[in-house]
Amino acid sequence: SIIKAIKDTVVYLDEINTISEAVISEAVGIRLIEQILNNFYLYYRSMFQNPLHKKATMSMDELKKIQIGNEYDLQRMLYALLVPIFPLIRQEVESDNGYGGMRADLYLEEYDLIIETKCTRASMTEKKLLEELGADGFYYKAKTVFFFVYDKKSIIKNPDVFKAAFVREQEKNGKNIKVIVLQPVEL
């Protein structure tokens, strides 16, 4: 009946309105971001390395031109992945640490969360990377800091030990720090 259809439509519209107004809680938002960072390699492989459909207008040659050359390329890709889910995320946000300025690669104010991207290069040593992350971890005032390291030059000898060296928890250290290391593997 028409009355039932109208009632069903009103219920449906109410549900859409409720969904559109839904806010992602801080815990869920942080977990989503962590999941995206941990699985970034799946996105990269699916987008740039997996075979294309035969009717696709893109070519593998075109896709192979898109590479992660440095941390700015990595930052752009992460931003593009995160902005549809977290539209308030911002890039290159300046802040004052009390002595000098700091610039967060990606910042999500609603969770007081920073994502700092690092991309290793031939001239970088593991010690230099440790020093950079240590300084950033100390100076960033955000409640949650993710370090996303794309170790394309495989300078990190033991990623698990490397990550464990930086993990901090809010209750003990006043902020959450997590490190995600992605080392490309070609067989």
Question: What residues fall within each predicted segment?
Answer:
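Internal, Lys/Arg-enriched amphipathic helical interaction segments that engage polyanionic partners
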Residues: 1-32
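Domain-level recognition of nuclease-like catalytic cores that cleave nucleotide substrates
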Residues: 2-8, 152-187
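Nuclease catalytic cores
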Residues: 29-34, 38, 67-71, 75
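Acidic-basic catalytic patches of nuclease active cores, encompassing PD-(D/E)XK
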Residues: 43-91
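Long, charged, glycine-rich C-terminal linkers/tails
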Residues: 58-61, 67, 89-109, 180-184
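Conserved catalytic cores of phosphodiester-cleaving nucleases, focusing on short active-site segments
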Residues: 106-108, 112-122
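Hydrophobic beta-strand segments of well-ordered beta-sheets in folded domains
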Residues: 111-113, 143-150, 177-179
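Catalytic cores of nucleic-acid endonucleases
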Residues: 119-169
